[in-house]
Amino acid sequence: MLRNTVKRLMTYTFKPSKQTSSFGPSVWLEFSPLAIKYNAVNLGQGFPNFEPPKFVKDAMIKTIEVGGFNQYTRSPGHIRLVKALSSVYSPYFGRELNAMTEIMVGVGASESLFAAISSIVNEGDEVILIEPFFDIYIGPILMAGGIPKFVTLKEEESSQAGSSDKKRSSKHWKINKEELAAAFTDKTKLIILNNPHNPVGKVYSKEELQEIADVVAKHGPNTTVISDEVYEWMTFDGEEHHRFATLPGMWERTITIGSAGKTFSITGWKVGWCIGPSNIIGAIANTHQYVPFSVPTPTQEAVAIALEQPNIKDYFKELATMYQNKRDTLLNSLTQAGLDPVIPQGTYFIMGDTSSIHLQGDQGKDTSITGMGLHLRDWNIARYLTTEYGVTTIPPSAFYCDDHQKIPENFVRFTFCKDDLTLQKAHDNLLKLKK
């Protein structure tokens, strides 16, 4: 009998859930380790490598020194933080936000998105994604049994490499509203927008957003909108960020996602939030309580103190100015290196055109990390830039569905949320492409 028991134990086989069985290593598990292996300048993953502002660090120091913030706080959000968020955001939404019912704080924008998607999508529901899309969107959709549908943001031909227009801009990347309308069916439960857009850097005009809103109103009577606006304070050259929820008839169906990590250069603090009507936020909060229950109290208290600064709007402007300067620095480097850049209107990413690079043989096919994407040009180019030129980037095909991964094959994504020394090192390495 004992022998039979041992035999049964030895034959145990683990099988992942059907909801997660299709998941494999992500693009981040390839290129961050590759950057470390080759001691490359990491312009791939979008995290700042500089310190947050002093007033933000002081807020955390004060929180720890005062004490009393070491236990669980209110599940949907620390009271001081949701009140601070209401105070900051109410003018931008053109309405008085109820701190207790219309705002929920999550473990970063990522968990906020997870809780929101999980609260909306049922098995068989369809979710429209605008390609390229941040890869984190797809996981919770599939875990909920949802079916992603894809509409592609396309660069106008007049703006592409080799055209007479010398300045390529993210504003020339457009959604075809007929294609968007055709993606809607009676099963469409959700559409996810990203504005400003990662990785293209597009900032949608109010007219473009209104076109999307019109399509949603006409073809998606029961469709909810998630508007991921974590780069809201990073717009350049006078571009204005318009919130989708402020368009006529859209507040009632829109969840707006924000991020302290992006706003204050504190991605490791993992504080994000959802803003929306109380019936939707209530459902998201119910989901949230069964995942992390609450966000760490000290980080919420510190973010609240930071948002309460009387000159916080000036800080938002300074943030945009800082990133515009860093953008211009990297644009200059890419242009000199022959990597025709798409000038971003916002975010801290730039798409660089690598058509001038011609791989030979097995160049770029380093298999020492995961060996993923060997059949895709942008993956091999990104590996080649890391291994041969010491600059790590991200292949944007990771932000497209399987059927569309050839679309961005001539691009790689660079980030400029790095200190000046890092950008200078990247500049020096990239210029070796011209030798």
Curated annotation (Swiss-Prot):
Q: Which residues carry this modification: N6-(pyridoxal phosphate)lysine?
A: K262
Q: What is its main location?
A: cytoplasm
List locations, semicolon-separated: Cytoplasm
Any idea of its EC number? 2.6.1.7, 4.4.1.13, 2.6.1.64
Name the positions where substrate binds.
Answer: G46, N198, R413
Q: Which UniProt keywords apply?
A: Aminotransferase, Cytoplasm, Lyase, Pyridoxal phosphate, Transferase
Write the signal peptide boundaries.
none
Q: Note whether Electron transport occurs among the keywords.
A: no
In the record, biological process GO terms are: biosynthetic process; L-kynurenine catabolic process
Keyword Transferase (UniProt): yes
Cofactor(s) the protein needs: pyridoxal 5'-phosphate
Top-level division of the source organism's lineage: Eukaryota
In alphabetical order, the GO MF annotations are: cysteine-S-conjugate beta-lyase activity; glutamine-phenylpyruvate transaminase activity; kynurenine-oxoglutarate transaminase activity; pyridoxal phosphate binding; transaminase activity
Q: Quaternary structure per UniProt?
A: Homodimer.
Q: Which PANTHER family match?
A: FI04487P
State the family it belongs to.
Answer: Belongs to the class-I pyridoxal-phosphate-dependent aminotransferase family.
Functional note = Catalyzes the irreversible transamination of the L-tryptophan metabolite L-kynurenine to form kynurenic acid (KA). Metabolizes the cysteine conjugates of certain halogenated alkenes and alkanes to form reactive metabolites. Catalyzes the beta-elimination of S-conjugates and Se-conjugates of L-(seleno)cysteine, resulting in the cleavage of the C-S or C-Se bond.
Which protein is depicted?
Kynurenine--oxoglutarate transaminase
